[in-house]
Amino acid sequence: MPTLNQLVRKPRKRPVAKSKVPALDANPQKRGVCTRVYTTTPKKPNSALRKVARVRLTNGFEVSSYIPGEGHNLQEHSVVLIRGGRVKDLPGVRYHIVRGTLDTAGVKNRKQSRSKYGAKRPK
């Protein structure tokens, strides 16, 4: 426990919280252009082909972002909107692409959780 005099000389240091999504620089979403669309395999106990896109953002960052839902229409030069949110079994993927905005189509035949996948209400 420091004395009052020691605290006057050198005050306590506040811990600095490190951002989990640095490329968004405090914005909820960011726009970017796909530079590469590919599939990756997840970490050890899981097995699949996860759809991922490399995106160059408007602020110059280049990040890997996950394409959620079944099927997508993305290719190189597609303009996408990304949000934060990591994929636990894909190391280095810390962002999600927002479905149903800009060049990203919503998921076809989606009945539940439609707002998360940019799907319109079925007739």
From Swiss-Prot:
The keyword DNA-binding does not apply. This is Small ribosomal subunit protein uS12. One of its GO terms (biological process) is translation. The gene is rpsL. One of its GO terms (molecular function) is tRNA binding. GO terms for cellular component: small ribosomal subunit. The modification 3-methylthioaspartic acid is found at D89. InterPro entries: NA-bd_OB-fold (IPR012340), Ribosomal_uS12 (IPR006032), Ribosomal_uS12_bac (IPR005679). With S4 and S5 plays an important role in translational accuracy. It comes from the Bacteria. Residues 108-123 have a biased composition (Basic residues).
